[in-house]
């Protein structure tokens, strides 16, 4: 396995791969040296790269795992499939529907496996819930209300202002699609899974609510 993207999510996967005896991580890639150094400490025998294309040139690598920022998912996945690698790519699949379609079309022609990391698909509690829904335990499903309780900040400290966008990419429109791709993708996927259908129409609205504030009445 070659691993591309060794930040927080990448290192989470790398630690989990240590529990799988037949998962042999032989190469690591990241364009941020501190992350690459941390990952290399987990797999000291693995080759290291700062350019994913050099990793893909290694013919001994059968599969790659991609845990880069969202804006890099599409082109790295497509390049990996063209290089003859199986691909596990973190969610969300890509920045745009057009990018997702491009990835899918290349995958269909490649003869390789492409898996997007929507982890609820193999979470036992979600699987059990879907079995009950599809068996009719709750009757006909006419609507779904999902929510996410999270009190965390996406902003991370940076050692230099020049690294702001590299490290805090989730906060910038050119690199991320915000809450919809970072969190709501899970909820949308659950809705499609539960109903066994894809949406015909989509509408959205949003707001920033400050429920913890006490406002004067006069």
Write out the residue ranges for each language-model feature:
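N-terminal Rossmann-like dinucleotide-binding module
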Residues: 1-43, 123, 133, 191
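Conserved small/polar residues in nucleotide/adenosyl-binding loops
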Residues: 211-218
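Beta-strand-loop-alpha-helix segment that lines the small-molecule cofactor/substrate pocket
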Residues: 63, 69-70, 74-122, 136, ...
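NAD(P)-dependent dehydrogenases' Rossmann-like dinucleotide-binding region
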Residues: 5, 9, 120, 137-161, ...
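Oxidoreductase and adenylate-handling cofactor-binding alpha/beta cores
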Residues: 123-145, 181-208
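A structured beta-alpha segment of the ubiquitous adenosine-cofactor-binding alpha/beta core
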Residues: 47-62
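Active-site rim elements
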Residues: 118, 174-181, 207-210
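Flexible glycine/proline-enriched surface loops and loop-helix/loop-strand junctions
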Residues: 112, 168-177
């Amino acid at each position: 396995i070659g691993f591309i993207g060794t930040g927080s999510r990448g290192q989470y996967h790398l630690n989990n791969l240590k529990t799988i005896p037949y998962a042999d991580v032989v190469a690591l890639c990241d364009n941020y040296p501190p992350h690459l150094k941390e990952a290399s400490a987990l797999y000291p025998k693995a080759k290291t790269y700062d350019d994913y294309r050099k990793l893909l040139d290694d013919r001994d690598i059968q599969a790659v795992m991609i845990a880069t920022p969202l804006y890099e998912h599409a082109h790295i996945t497509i390049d990996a499939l063209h290089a003859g690698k199986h691909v596990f790519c973190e969610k969300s699949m890509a920045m745009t529907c057009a990018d997702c379609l491009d990835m899918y079309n290349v995958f269909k022609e490649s003869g390789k496996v492409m898996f997007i990391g929507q982890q609820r698909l193999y979470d036992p509690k979600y699987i059990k819930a879907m079995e009950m829904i599809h068996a009719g335990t709750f009757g006909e499903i006419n609507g779904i209300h999902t929510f996410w309780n999270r009190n965390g900040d996406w902003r991370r400290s940076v050692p230099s202002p020049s690294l702001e966008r590299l490290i805090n990419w989730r906060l910038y429109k050119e690199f991320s699609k915000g809450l919809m791709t970072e969190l709501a993708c899970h909820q949308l996927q659950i809705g499609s899974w539960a109903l066994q259908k894809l949406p015909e129409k989509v509408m959205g609205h949003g707001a920033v609510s400050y429920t913890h504030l006490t406002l004067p009445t006069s």
